[in-house]
């Protein structure tokens, strides 16, 4: 990761020369994949948590559903954080240096991907700081749904 990558990620447009410099393409690609896998894991966990409570026939009250939503989302986000580097490794080992550089270079200019990654980091941070783990899960879930809607519902 470099200062140029962070500047682009934060929304400050670097020069063309700075955009050409990709000193750590594996790390840049890994961050992108890990953010996406955490978002996906949190959303799937948030859906499966209440469903598992419903299937288990335990005492079904509102607080139990909220707790299962949060714990499912947290577990999904943790699994996504673990799977992100694994998925990155599996993808990168099949790429040569030029194709990896090309992928990172394209990600730097892909406004939809940048918007989705920025939204995930920002909403997860705001959610965590405002409401703890519940806010983190809701932030990750909403960031995925909103960014998909903003990019034209291309699932």
Predicted regions and their residues:
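Periodic glycine anchor positions in long extracellular repeat architectures
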Residues: 41, 76, 80, 122-123
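Juxtamembrane "helix exit" motif at the C-terminal ends of alpha-helical transmembrane segments
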Residues: 44-61, 129-130, 145
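Perimembrane loop-to-helix junctions flanking transmembrane segments
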Residues: 57-65, 104-105
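Hydrophobic alpha-helical membrane-embedded segments
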Residues: 71-92
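Membrane-interacting alpha-helical segments
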Residues: 90-155
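Intrinsically disordered, low-complexity N-proximal targeting/linker segments that flank membranes
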Residues: 1-47, 61-64, 150-155
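Membrane-helix exit/interface motif
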Residues: 50-59, 85-95
């Amino acid at each position: 990761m470099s200062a140029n990558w962070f500047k682009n990620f934060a929304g400050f447009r670097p020069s063309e020369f700075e955009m050409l410099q990709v000193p750590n393409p594996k790390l840049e690609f890994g961050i992108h994949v890990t953010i996406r896998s955490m978002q996906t894991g949190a959303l799937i966990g948030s859906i499966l948590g209440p469903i598992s409570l419903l299937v288990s026939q335990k005492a079904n009250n509102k607080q139990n559903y909220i707790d299962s939503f949060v714990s499912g989302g947290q577990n999904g986000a943790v699994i996504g954080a673990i799977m992100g580097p694994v998925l990155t490794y599996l993808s990168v080992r099949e790429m040569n240096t030029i194709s990896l550089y090309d992928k990172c270079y394209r990600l730097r200019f892909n406004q939809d991907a940048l918007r989705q990654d920025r939204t995930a980091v920002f909403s997860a941070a705001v959610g965590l700081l405002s409401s703890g783990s519940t806010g983190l899960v809701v932030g990750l879930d909403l960031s995925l749904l909103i960014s998909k809607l903003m990019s034209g519902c291309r699932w």
